């Protein structure tokens, strides 16, 4: 059976609730379809949803399990969960079945819509931008010192100053992220990956 056969099999649950239930399970948290918006349920358990339109390479860089929306030959939408990614093959969960499929096969049915969960390190809600004074800056400074060895002794510690911005830009360049000094979702996820934050599911092994 190919991917199309599984998509057209009406006995396999391929709805968003099935996909969210599997995704929440990978993160070790609880999902109840009858309790409302899944992203609100995630937030209540210290996770955030991130819904994007992008490429497989972008998902590889994020290195988090992702729900993809696939469109079959009849135009019907189906949700699958990508649990592992290699160079040319993905492991997906479709309903309760695990399949290894080529990225080429996925590309025939996928137009780029995906959703991931990620775990913010602190309770700050907004991006960290140069010049801001925020509790999240303390986390950023400490995290980069662990990852890169670059120590910024700026006082006050919660002020995002010029030295820290330079370290952030260097880090973003190394990670092939947008080099703008703004610590948004992608930069925070990259930092969490390098820190190997406990209880975080990855798509591929960390080198």
Model-assigned labels for residue ranges:
Residues 128-135, 142-194, 200-206:
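Short acidic, glycine/serine/threonine-rich helix-capping segments at coil-helix boundaries
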């Amino acid at each position: 059976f190919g991917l199309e056969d599984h998509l057209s099999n009406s006995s396999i649950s391929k709805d968003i609730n099935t996909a969210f239930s599997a995704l929440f399970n990978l993160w070790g948290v609880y999902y109840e379809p009858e309790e409302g918006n899944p992203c609100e349920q995630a937030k209540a358990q210290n996770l955030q949803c991130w819904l994007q339109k992008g490429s497989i390479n972008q998902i590889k860089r994020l290195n988090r399990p992702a729900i993809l929306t696939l469109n079959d030959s009849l135009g019907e939408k189906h949700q699958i969960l990508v649990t592992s990614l290699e160079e040319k093959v993905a492991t997906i969960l479709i309903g309760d079945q695990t399949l290894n499929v080529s990225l080429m096969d996925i590309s025939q049915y996928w137009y780029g819509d995906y959703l991931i969960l990620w775990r913010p390190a602190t309770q700050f809600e907004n991006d960290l931008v140069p010049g801001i004074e925020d509790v999240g800056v303390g986390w950023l400074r400490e995290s980069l010192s662990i990852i890169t060895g670059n120590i910024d002794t700026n006082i006050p510690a919660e002020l995002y100053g010029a030295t820290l911005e330079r370290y952030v830009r260097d880090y973003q360049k190394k990670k092939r992220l947008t080099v703008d000094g703004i610590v948004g979702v992608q930069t925070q996820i990259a930092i969490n990956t390098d820190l190997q934050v406990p209880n975080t599911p990855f798509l591929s092994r960390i080198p």
